């Protein structure tokens, strides 16, 4: 869901250099991440992409120095764990349908999921914490 990389990481679609095509869903995923033109060029040319360039293209969320990578990943995991995970799960459900749905169907799904989120204990806790000027304590419910 959230893709991060070490600054030393690189990415390559080298299939074209040996007469093959990208597989394992590469022709499906990469164009959706970075656009058809850029994906076509990377897949046909077989260029190596640095982690920083991958971030700039939208392939990954963040790049961390190698020596702090593990600590930064732990920070992200902790931050997510302390968030309203029920709402995050509903967000993921909506995102999973975005390329399959029409705009109308996606708006209907968002309406259903937003109603579910709005009836959650986490939403009540989040709004109470905001009004009381305190940090929320979410339970994933």
Model-assigned labels for residue ranges:
Residues 1-88, 119-120, 125-128, 134:
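Crotonase-fold acyl-CoA enzyme core
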Residues 17-19, 98-102:
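Glycine- (often His-adjacent) and acidic-residue-rich active-site loop
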Residues 42-43, 94-98, 113-118:
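Helix-loop "lid/cap" segments that line or gate small-molecule binding pockets
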Residues 73, 102-106:
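Bacterial helix-turn-helix/winged-helix DNA-binding modules and their immediately adjacent linkers
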Residues 99, 135-141:
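Short C-terminal tail/terminal secondary-structure segment
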């Amino acid at each position: 869901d959230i893709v991060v990389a070490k600054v030393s990481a690189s990415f390559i679609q080298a299939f074209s250099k040996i007469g093959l095509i990208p597989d394992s869903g590469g022709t499906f995923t990469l164009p959706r991440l970075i656009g058809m033109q850029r994906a076509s060029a990377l897949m046909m040319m077989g260029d190596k992409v640095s982690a920083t360039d991958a971030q700039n293209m939208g392939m990954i969320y963040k790049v961390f120095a190698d020596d702090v990578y593990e600590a930064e990943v732990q920070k992200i995991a902790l931050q997510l764990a302390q968030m309203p995970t029920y709402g995050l799960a509903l967000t993921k459900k909506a995102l999973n349908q975005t390329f399959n749905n029409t705009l109308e169907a996606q708006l209907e799904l968002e309406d259903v999921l937003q109603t579910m989120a709005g009836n959650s204990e986490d939403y009540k806790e989040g709004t109470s914490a905001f009004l009381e000027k305190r940090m929320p304590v979410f339970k994933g419910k």
